[in-house]
């Protein structure tokens, strides 16, 4: 497979862009080789600068639930373009978008549009702190909430009460206000809350984690978090940037039946355009400026092009509940075929999945938090990634990222993926 053009672009990029990429995982550091530079996409396919074509399972890291080049979304964008790229003023589209989100997600009574998932989570934490008058937050090891300082914290062994900076540039003072617990460990949460009585403003969690691979909440875990937050006057925030509108018309909270106080959103709500949102109870959200004292603003927030794309996809999803059944069935079919291929080789690797999100972990133990996810054989994953790539299948270049199925993945394409998987597994296991 030729990649001379991509290699040349990467060489040029490294001279002017840190690491040659605008988001670290794209650099292929975890899997070796040079990243592929993509020039176009259609349906379930990516095409790189050397004209290699790949069936892809990352959906632009989640947003492209209908596949690439969807005419419904592209028409909405084309129509909006005739009115200007940006107004810097309120527009009809942002009102319609907010009304639609509120109608689809029962826990959200008011919503504010921003430009990214990171902005959404940073803003939600600020609002929770302002609303409660408390400063500390609890997050979960392995959950990713964007690159805000408060979230770049990881707990070392046994460090359940004090965060440590996980990136140079994160002040120790910020780290001190971010407490971490293992995902799915409700007792660790109870201990943190008890040791920091009346100091916790918010608990933020991915209700389905996607950035340590796909990791699901244990039965009763989300319900227990809800109970703790109710008892201790803590704002429960679900980060549904990845799972929102991906797992159901109301996201993971619709699947698991637990309502948070606040929700952050992104990815799918922009239909591929850069966008984010945060919302929740009116009692909380009415504290956001200009109706309240908690400041948050953005020049391009509510951008009419992004709103038009988002409206198109959300209206379609709301009107097409059968799509989720289709996506779930196709994901089940794909995983069944992949697992069968593994079994024929005597392999028992762990699959985690819910809806159209899934990960195959290169370990045979159950994966339910970051520590168990890290038991995966990363060298085997890297070899698998390259073997699949050579067969025209583009995966996330990290063991610790969820894969996604779009509606563009037909049974025929799923069979191609299963065949490539079987060949790749045989190759890397000799």
From Swiss-Prot:
Places the protein is found: Cytoplasm
N6-(pyridoxal phosphate)lysine sites (modified residues):
267
Catalytic activity, reaction form: (S)-4-amino-5-oxopentanoate = 5-aminolevulinate
Pfam families per the record? Answer: Aminotran_3
Its signal peptide is none
One example of the protein's molecular function in GO is: glutamate-1-semialdehyde 2,1-aminomutase activity
Subunit composition and interactions: Homodimer.
The family database entries (NCBIfam families) matched by this protein are listed as: hemL (TIGR00713), PRK00062.1 (NF000818)
What family does the database annotate? Belongs to the class-III pyridoxal-phosphate-dependent aminotransferase family. HemL subfamily.
Output the PANTHER family linked to this UniProt entry: GLUTAMATE-1-SEMIALDEHYDE 2,1-AMINOMUTASE, GLUTAMATE-1-SEMIALDEHYDE 2,1-AMINOMUTASE 1, CHLOROPLASTIC-RELATED
Q: What is this protein called?
A: Glutamate-1-semialdehyde 2,1-aminomutase
Q: Which organism is it from?
A: Cytophaga hutchinsonii (strain ATCC 33406 / DSM 1761 / CIP 103989 / NBRC 15051 / NCIMB 9469 / D465)
């Amino acid at each position: 497979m030729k990649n001379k053009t991509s290699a040349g672009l990467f060489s040029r990029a490294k001279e002017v862009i840190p690491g040659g990429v605008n988001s670290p995982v794209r650099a292929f550091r975890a899997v070796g080789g040079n990243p592929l530079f993509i020039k176009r996409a259609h349906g379930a396919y990516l095409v790189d600068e050397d004209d290699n074509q790949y069936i892809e399972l990352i959906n632009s890291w989640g947003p492209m639930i209908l596949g690439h080049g969807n005419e419904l979304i592209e028409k909405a964008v084309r129509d909006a373009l005739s009115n200007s790229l940006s107004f810097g003023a309120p527009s009809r589209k942002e009102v319609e978008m907010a009304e639609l989100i509120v109608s689809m997600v029962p826990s959200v009574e008011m919503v504010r549009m921003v430009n990214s998932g990171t902005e959404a989570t940073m803003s939600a934490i600020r609002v929770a702190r302002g609303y409660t008058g408390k400063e500390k937050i609890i997050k979960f090891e392995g959950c990713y909430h964007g690159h805000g300082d408060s979230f770049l914290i990881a707990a070392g062994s046994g460090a359940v009460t004090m965060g440590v900076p996980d990136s140079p540039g994160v002040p120790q003072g910020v780290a001190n206000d971010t407490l971490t617990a293992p995902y799915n460990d409700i007792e660790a949460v109870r201990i943190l809350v008890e040791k920091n009585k009346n100091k916790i403003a918010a608990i933020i969690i991915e209700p389905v984690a996607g950035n340590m691979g796909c990791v699901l909440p244990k039965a009763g875990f989300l319900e227990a978090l809800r109970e703790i937050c109710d008892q201790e006057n803590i704002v429960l925030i679900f980060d549904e940037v990845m799972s929102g509108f991906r797992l159901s018309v109301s996201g993971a909270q619709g699947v698991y039946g637990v309502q948070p106080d606040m929700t952050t959103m992104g990815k799918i709500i922009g239909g591929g355009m850069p966008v984010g949102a945060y919302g929740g109870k009116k009692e909380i959200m009415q504290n956001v400026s200009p109706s309240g004292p908690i400041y948050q603003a953005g020049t391009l927030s509510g951008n009419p092009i992004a709103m038009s794309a988002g409206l198109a996809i959300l209206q379609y999803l709301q009107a097409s509940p059968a799509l989720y059944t289709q996506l779930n069935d196709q994901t089940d079919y794909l995983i069944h075929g992949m697992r069968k291929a593994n079994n024929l080789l005597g392999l028992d690797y762990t699959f985690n999945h819910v809806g159209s999100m899934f990960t195959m972990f290169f370990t045979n133990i159950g994966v339910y938090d970051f520590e168990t996810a890290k038991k995966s054989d990363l060298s085997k994953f890297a070899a698998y990634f390259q073997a699949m790539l050579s067969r025209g299948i583009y995966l996330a270049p990290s063991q610790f990222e969820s894969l996604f199925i779009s509606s563009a993945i037909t049974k025929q394409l799923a069979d191609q993926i299963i065949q490539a998987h079987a060949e790749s597994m045989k190759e890397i296991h000799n």
